[in-house]
């Protein structure tokens, strides 16, 4: 009995010794965690700095404009760009099925002629992946090669990622709508802003991970059975 215990002690000491396999595994695991934390933190700092420094480009031009719904300012900005000739047609992607073209026209104070000829309403998208798939179909239908993308600056990186994944042959030009909370130079001391930034970064990382693994990526489109009244895209008259 005593001899068995004496024999077991060296075996345990061998596992936990400075060069034992368990110690090597623990050290390797800790090192891996430190590296991953460093990569994650560095990525977040890059993301936050990039988002906070985004500005609308001067002289932007494209074949057409796409705006991803989510706020009045985005749509108003996109309609203004269409009015200014930045693109010759506008897709409003992710419109609520209960919202009409007339309601959006009145909200943005756009002209009836412009909305009738040049504004298409996308009703199928329910998330950013859906926006990208809805946009890719619209781009193919119109044979466009360059698109000005209008969305919130928090949302721009993930939007461009999904759009380029769905339509890799298209050139996408970012036209961010600047959030008021990021217009201030000291946004990084405001917990709510940092929380939003971190949340968007996590969603951006998840989107990249889905593309790498192919796991958990749906089409993001509203099913016809769920809403028979919602057309795929309500096209303006040519």
Where are these regions (language model features)?
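Short alpha-helical segments used as structural interaction elements across diverse proteins
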Residues: 20-24, 71, 200
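Short linear elements at protein peripheries
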Residues: 62, 214-238
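A transmembrane-helix-recognition feature enriched in membrane-embedded lipid enzymes
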Residues: 190, 194-220
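Structural signature of transmembrane alpha-helix termini at the membrane-water interface
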Residues: 42-49, 78, 205, 209-212
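N-terminal intrinsically disordered, acidic low-complexity segments at the extreme N-terminus
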Residues: 1-12
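A structural signal for short, hydrophobic/glycine-enriched beta-strand patches
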Residues: 2, 48-191, 198
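N-terminal type II signal-anchor transmembrane helix
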Residues: 13-55
């Amino acid at each position: 009995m005593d001899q068995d215990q004496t024999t077991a002690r060296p075996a345990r000491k061998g596992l936990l010794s400075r060069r034992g396999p368990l110690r090597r595994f623990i050290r390797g695991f800790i090192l891996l965690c430190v590296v991953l934390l460093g990569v994650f933190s560095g990525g977040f700092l890059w993301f936050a700095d990039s988002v906070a420094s985004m500005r609308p480009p001067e002289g932007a031009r494209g074949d057409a404009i796409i705006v991803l719904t989510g706020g009045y300012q985005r749509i108003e900005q996109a309609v203004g760009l269409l009015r200014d000739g930045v693109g010759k047609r506008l897709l409003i992607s992710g419109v609520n099925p209960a919202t009409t073209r007339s309601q959006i026209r009145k909200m943005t104070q756009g002209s009836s002629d412009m909305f009738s000829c040049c504004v298409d309403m996308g009703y199928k998208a329910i998330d950013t992946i859906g926006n990208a798939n809805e946009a890719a179909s619209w781009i193919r239908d119109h044979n466009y090669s360059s698109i000005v993308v209008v969305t919130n600056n928090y949302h721009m990186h993930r939007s461009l990622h999904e759009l380029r994944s769905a339509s890799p042959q298209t050139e996408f030009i970012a036209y961010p709508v600047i959030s008021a909370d990021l217009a201030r130079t000291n946004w990084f001391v405001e917990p709510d802003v940092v929380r939003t930034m971190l949340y968007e970064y996590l969603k951006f990382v998840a989107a990249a991970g889905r593309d790498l693994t192919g796991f958990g990526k749906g089409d993001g489109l509203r099913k016809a059975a769920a809403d028979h009244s919602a057309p795929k895209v309500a096209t303006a008259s040519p």
